[in-house]
Amino acid sequence: MIHSGRTRLEQKVNEIKVHKGIQTVERMEQSTTTGNQWSKQQYLPYQHYYHHYHNYYYYYNDHHHRHHHQHDHQHHQRQQQCCDRHHQHHQNQEYLPSSCYMSPSIAHISMSNMKKQSSGVQLTWVFHDDEAQINKKLPKELLLRILSYLDVVSLCRCAQVSKAWNVLALDGSNWQRIDLFDFQRDVEGPVIENISRRCGGFLRQLSLRGCQSIGNNSMKTLAQSCPNIEELNLSQCKKISDVTCAALSSHCSKLQRLNLDSCPEITDLALKDLSDGCRLLTHINLSWCELLTDNGVEALARGCPELRSFLSKGCRQLTDRAIKCLARYCPNLEAINLHECRNITDDAVRELSERCPRLHYVCISNCSNLTDASLLMLAQHCPLLSILECVACTHFTDAGFQALARNCRLLEKMDLEECTLITDATLIHLAMGCPRLEKLSLSHCELITDEGIRQLALSPCAAENLAVLELDNCPLITDASLDHLLQACHNLERIELYDCQLITRSGIRRLRVINNFSHLPNIKVHAYFAPMTPPPSAGASRQRYCRCCVIL
């Protein structure tokens, strides 16, 4: 008698297992324990039957075993109600990325409130009792507020709990900020269209970075459904073209931040459309949109005078004309990236510096035509400059950096890699004039010596703020520089010493035993050393070193 109720339940489960050849309950549990993700197509056919088995939990006692086998009719009614409820729920189910779905036993079944008792046989509604209590005691507004703190995955899981929670979890107010980068392989057009309709006017920020399956049709639906969007990241959405920008221009007049990094089909026409309909743009990233020319940038600058950040890394067709238009029409510009815009000259940097005094981030790396005149203009007109990247500006000398250090005292990060003409004099000027300096790259600056590092180490910036120093391929740097840095720099976190031929293994090892090293317990020193090779002839008297690198 004790096990008669369980026997009938097991019979029912066996019927379920063979019905239409569906996957067995045991297989479902195995999927859960192995961490498999279930897509909508895999998941929905099974959950209707799965709840027959799992929405009930039995525990037994000799004194009340009769509760197992009485009221069979009521038991059947409960099962039928459960099935009907979930059938209706999944008819209304939204399509979501498969990464958002969980195995049924996790997404739908909660056993956490089951308390084992030494007496009493009960048939317990485990999850639905909990849900009913939550819905009864917490008003809808409070539940919405709680759900608003969840990420995308958690919201999708909550949407699978019940019909009531589906409505709450998918309420547009919970989807104001969405980042689908983690699901980029699963996100296709129907997902974006569904999100667009669901969120509507609530959506403010959306990141589709890396979602390469997204095309113009989906983005047109998004633009039409979400007119209040303010920030949109389409980086690496390679199917996006000018059509998307035309839709944004027509429907999304509140757009302020747009990232089109590595969207190769974007042309000048896209910028002209944006300048007409998205005049509130403040930040735009056009990096590696290699079809852009001066015409598109001029149209954008004229139509979007509030621009504060313009990133055009790798836009090799841009010339001085584009930069002068930005300077003329966007005086509030604060950040500009001209990496590999090789046609830019000192004349463009001069006008940019004069007209945009609020600049705090400037990248002119690989602009090989620039000279010290550009640094002098930045020093004279941009006192708020805090980040300067000028990799491979091979015409820059100590004189330019001396002027910069004298007037730009807020500098925090400088990348001077491959500025091959600078010497220790630059370090002396930076040490005296830039007390906030946190990160400095001097890689491939082959004229830097231990004396320059010593002067830098003795400066206030090194003592209090310097955290990262990169000295890759500085052939005149020796172990003495390590001693200077370790003794004086109290916040140093990382030193790069790759291919510094005069740095020795013993110098690196000595760091562990220096008395003052205890104040830098987390410092990382990155270096590698060339292995010794056999001499080319038997009579050779010196060991030879190759440039091949062995990681330390």
Regions found by a protein language model. Name each.
Residues 163, 173, 201, 224-227, ...:
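Inter-repeat linker/turn residues at the boundaries of leucine-rich repeats
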Residues 144, 148-153, 171-175, 184, ...:
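Short amphipathic alpha-helical interaction elements and helix-loop-helix interfaces
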Residues 2-50, 78, 82-83, 92-109, ...:
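C-terminal capping region of solenoid repeat domains
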Residues 2-60, 64-69, 78, 82-223, ...:
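N-terminal adaptor-interaction module of cullin-RING ubiquitin ligase components
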Residues 283-294, 298-320, 324-328, 334, ...:
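Internal metal/ion-chelating core segments
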Residues 178-181, 204-208, 232-234, 258-260, ...:
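Conserved hydrophobic beta-strand positions in leucine-rich repeat
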Residues 131, 140-143, 160-166, 187-196, ...:
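Leucine-rich repeat
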Residues 130-142, 150-157, 170, 183-187, ...:
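Short amphipathic alpha-helical molecular recognition features
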